[in-house]
Structures are given as structure tokens and as C-alpha cells.
Amino acid sequence: KIIAFVSPQIWAWKESRLEQITTDFDLMLSIFPFEKSWYSKRAPKFPVEFVGHPLVDRFSIEKKENNRISSNPDLFSDEPEVLLLPGSRQREIERHLPVMLDAVKIIANKIKIKVLIVLPNEKMHNLAKYIIPTGTEILIQIGSLEKALEHANLTIASSGTVTLECAWFRVPTVVLYKTSFLTYSIGKLLVKIRYFAMPNILAENEVF
């Protein structure tokens, strides 16, 4: 038997792939609870089992509670920490980071803040240094996202799995994803979901 772990997001767009998926696989293991009912309505004979999201295994409820309260001395600090998560790919950082820096500038004009950018590797770190204006007081950290989320008061993040981590740590988050006008126009015609941030999709509400 051929088992698929993690369903393609055909519930968002390209539902036409459903027939091919049900032909290619004998079982779908889903990481999002709503996917099982989505498949059952459109392909009742295709077996789908919800097995939970891998992120849940990384964080315990006890750790989450401790991180956001007792272990976070900066939670009510006079200098809140704004965490920027522009993405992991070069194109994402090139498009998202300038927008995030503009947002930070607006916030900094109103209150004193600390700003931290978390990036996945040294290559993206070097790219970010070219984008950040000279003299800007911003820290850049490679990896250790969980530690950064423990102390963040606000996150500005690119859409993706990272938004689930922000939700898990209960950090208020602004989600963005900047693309070309052509891609946006095509996506607007094809995408069938109301929200693009995964926490909002799961909650069926505007959490972020």
C-alpha cells in the first residue's frame, strides 16, 4: 500500500488534483483535523486519518504556559520585544523584510521597542544585513526560534508553519505574504479559502 503523510493543500486551491491523489494513494495521513471531513465529502471511499501535527510533539502544554508567563520577564516590560520572521527563503526575505522594517519604524515612532529578527542560516543572515539600514538597532539571531518566541510581545511573520508556532506560544502576530501583482491576481481567482494564515484556517476565525 502507498500511504501519503501530509495532504497537499488542495482544499485551498487545485481541487482538481483530488482524483489523482485518490488514485495514487491508498491512505492519507492528515495533520489538520478539518481535512478528514473535507475528503469525506468529496471522496467518501478514500480513507483519511487525522494523526495530529508534528509541532505538537515539540511543545508541551506545560512549557507553553511557563513560556508566556513565569519564564517571560519582558512580558510587561517598558520595552516590548517585536520579533520579525520574514521567512526562510531568499525571495521571501527580500520581499518581506523591507515591509516589516517599515512597520517596525511606525511602531518605534510611538513607543520604545526592541527588535529581533530570527533567520534560519548564515546565508540569510548576510542577506538581511544588506537590507537593514545602517545604524538601525536590530538584533539578528540564527535559529532558536522557540527561545525568541518565549520573550516576544509581538510577532510580524510571513505566512507558513511558523504562524502555528506563534499561536502555540500565544504571541500576538501580524501575518503577511508579499507576492507579485500577477501572482496575487491569479491566486485571488483560484484560492477558495477566506484566510491564508493557518491558525485562522484552523480556528475558522480571524485569530491573527
At which residue positions do the language-model features occur?
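Nucleotide-activated sugar donor-binding and catalytic core shared by glycosyltransferases
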Residues: K1-F208
